[in-house]
């Protein structure tokens, strides 16, 4: 299990892991490379292709643990890491199943116009970094909810619903990372996990979608689900936004569906 875009493992993933563990499942939760307690440079850079390789390494690690059956390993991802998991699963024959929630499935659908408009600037930034310049950083979240509501925010996760997540993190004392490298956008702009959905079969997929998601395109998520072959299962969490499925009442509905999927898969 890894968190989503710019996320850290302590941001509610422990709640999912605890419920899985209570049901008898061993769980590995880790920060993506360059984030939190994980090593790697550059710091605060999202690179989906490298994160795919890290899932393969995570499988290698857990499959060697004495209490893990390597024939019963499931990849789990959320938001950006959901997309990472979908693409990783498409090419990894070793795993037994896939759970994704509110997955990022298409850069073209999600950030295509923005990335195209910024392409020249981003490639100049890439060249400057390779030449020894310091990396430019971009804000992940708006500074205020008023900024988000205005529609003028230049933050990457600029929807007002992000403040549901921010406020809950602050309430629980969970750390937030508020900046990513500008070159993150170059890494993300070619990421198209929906192109590989058909390759995941025959591994079972559970896709959990938040009905009112404004951060990750719900239309793209549902389209990607249609691309996937059986066996597959779709869970739509009604009246929930992108971040509400991490905690509270919507979390309970979400985790119930995930545990039922695992029970059907292994028991």
Residues covered by each model-derived region:
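Conserved alpha/beta-hydrolase "acid-adjacent" motif
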Residues: 214-220
């Amino acid at each position: 299990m890894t968190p989503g875009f710019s996320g850290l493992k302590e941001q509610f993933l422990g709640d999912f892991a605890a419920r899985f563990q209570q049901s008898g499942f061993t769980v590995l939760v880790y920060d993506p490379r360059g984030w939190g307690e994980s090593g790697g440079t550059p710091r605060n850079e999202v690179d989906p292709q490298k994160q795919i390789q890290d899932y393969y390494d995570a499988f290698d690690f857990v499959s060697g643990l004495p209490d893990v059956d390597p024939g019963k390993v499931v990849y789990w991802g959320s938001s950006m890491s959901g997309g990472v998991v979908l693409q990783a699963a498409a090419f990894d024959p070793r795993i037994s199943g896939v759970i994704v929630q509110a997955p990022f499935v298409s850069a073209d659908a999600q950030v295509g116009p923005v990335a195209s408009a910024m392409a020249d600037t981003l490639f100049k930034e890439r060249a400057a970094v390779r030449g020894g310049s310091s990396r430019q950083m971009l804000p992940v979240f708006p500074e205020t909810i008023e900024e988000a509501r205005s529609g003028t925010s230049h933050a990457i996760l600029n929807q007002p619903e992000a403040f549901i997540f921010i406020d809950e993190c602050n309430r629980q004392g969970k750390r937030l990372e508020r900046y990513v490298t500008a070159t993150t956008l170059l890494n993300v702009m070619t990421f198209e996990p929906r192109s590989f959905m058909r390759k995941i079969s025959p591994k079972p997929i559970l896709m959990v979608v938040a009905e009112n998601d404004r951060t990750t395109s719900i239309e793209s998520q549902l389209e990607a689900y249609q691309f996937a072959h059986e066996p597959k299962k779709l869970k739509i969490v009604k009246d929930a936004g992108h971040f509400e499925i991490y905690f509270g009442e919507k979390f309970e509905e979400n985790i119930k569906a995930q545990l039922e999927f695992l029970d059907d898969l292994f028991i």
